[in-house]
Amino acid sequence: MKKAQIKKSVSALAMAAVIAVSLFGYGCGAKPASTSSDAGVSGDFTGTAKGFGGDVSVTLTLTDGAITGCTAEGKDETQGVGSEAIAKMPGEIAESGSIAVDGVSGATVTSTAIKEAAAAALTAAGLNPDDYKTAVENNATAEDSTVDADVVVVGAGGAGMTAAITAAGEGKSVVILESQSMVGGNSVRATGGMNAGKTVYQDENEFGESAGVEKTLKTAAEKYADNETITALAKTVSEQWAAYQANPTGYFDSVELMELDTMIGGKGINDPELVETLCANSADAIDWLDEHGITLHNVSSFGGASVKRIHRPVNAEGKTVSVGSYMIPLLQENCEKAGVKMMLDTTATEILTDANGAAVGVKATGASGEIVTVNAKAVVLASGGFGANLDMVVKYKPELKGFMTTNAPGIQGQGIEMAEAIGAATVDMDQIQIHPTVEANTAALITEGLRGDGAILINEEGQRFIDEVGTRDVVSAAEIAQTGSYSWLVVDQAMVDASSVIQGYIKKGYTVTGATYEELGKAMGVDAAAFAETMEKWNGYVEAKNDPDFGRTSFANPLNTAPYYAVKVTAGVHHTMGGLKINANTEVLNEKGEVIPGLFAAGEVTGGVHGANRLGGNAVADFTVFGRIAGAAASDYAA
């Protein structure tokens, strides 16, 4: 088993999340707006508006009717997304004297709430908010600039920041170029956790997933007998499973079982070498995150995994939280500690090459149109896939026209296109994943972890229709085939009590509720009697640990603690499995299969890791494992 050699940089970091900001005289290069204010009004006035996660409040300081200060609070806004708007916009309002400042890209709901709350504060002061909506002219100018670095990273998501931290830990100077006004990319939107095989945290759980292992081995034998990689992995896992049954010590999992699950999930078209690299380095990646103050110790079930393998963060109360909004601020903190230079609102447009075709830097465009040239010894592309570029999605998969997307606005495929321009090869570009649990009204991603923790899916007829913890492609296809192409994700109060994530969904207004099964059925608008019967039947299946209807093998607890909740979900574009062709050292390859010197890539910008379908939890594993490898490889190349 090959295992990428990655040097560890040990530092335990802690981060205090600040989401209340008071800024006066904030300098942003904007021209102060003129207003027709009441010159007699001075003091502090507060307004409130509905944000993404809860209420957002804004307090304006008025001096003779002019805005001279602004603070904002929104403790329930998503860390790393809405919190960025709360950190940035108050200062711009204070300096410009206008509430018509630009919002933060990717944090539209929170940005709008800040403006509405500011308007409410003006109303509370007896003023007309319309008098404070003068458009803010950005007269800031910037000159073209050149920056020199050992390593330049394109994209400040999970893969990019992991690569930067690793390279900086090797003593290299690192610059990150990020097209958006905040870090995180798609990574900050990740809700579940990180898959890792054979970790010490799995051993803290009692093993009860025999049926899952047997089901996977049966699938390998019946559906993939002609796939040499899957057959060989299944043989190894069968031997490991027999040995474990003879001496059941600890929790059963292995690198090979994780590989087998990943290959089956990807329908056998994954690059076996990349899958092996992903899985062999996953447990070490959990340890690396620990060393950097990022703890993913709660282990649970997830779609497509034979055993409990997904590692999740919890809050101070022990409740699970979304992995992306937890990890990204901590990775950003690690970047700052490591001395990484972060250039936001700077969009990479071209990979610079020398006479021999080696990557030697990146050209980018800044927020004011200035040209930024970064000369570097190595280039790491970590700019994400193309799930937010719906034209590009439809180009490669026309049947997805009209689908909503869970992707961040900056996920446009630029990294792929830049690399193609210098001869890079791509793979699996038509493999685009749709996710079955996307909130039907807002396109917000509803975590797959709920199904792993016991939630079920119900159709308009009040019935289950699929093994809820199957792979995303299978569950999505079944959901699309239902009446109206949607379903309801059902949980009970016991699940709510254990998850701050579900509590967040309730606060955001995603759920309907009922004190009884019949009441919830009516609230959902499904056949209430049939739904009640389905719930009673399902609870019996959980007690018996047997699902004769759809063969589900992952069971948690019965859904029998009132009240009950449901979220209406549908399928949406979620992940692009295709991208740049790389080897196990994250070196980008050209059409001849040759390495493009100095060019590395990690994360969703690459292809081959996930095949035809990505398993939930493997994206975080992907960006952590390959981000580390890319950072180390780029560092070695730049030596």
Positions of PLM-derived features:
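Conserved redox-cofactor binding core of oxidoreductases
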Residues: 253-370, 389-391, 542-561
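Active-site- and interface-proximal helix/loop "cap" or "latch" segments in soluble metabolic
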Residues: 36-136
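A glycine-rich dinucleotide-binding beta-alpha-beta segment and adjacent secondary-structure elements
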Residues: 350, 530-613
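Beta1/beta-strand and adjacent pyrophosphate-binding region of the FAD-binding site
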Residues: 141-159, 175
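Internal hydrophobic alpha-helix adjacent to the cofactor/substrate pocket in enzyme cavities
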Residues: 418-425, 527, 532-535, 622-639
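Glycine-rich FAD pyrophosphate-binding loop
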Residues: 169-190, 207
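Glycine-rich loop(s) and the adjacent beta-strand/alpha-helix scaffold that form part
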Residues: 367-439, 626-629
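An anion/pyrophosphate-binding glycine-rich loop and adjacent beta-alpha core
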Residues: 220-234, 412, 416-420, 425-528
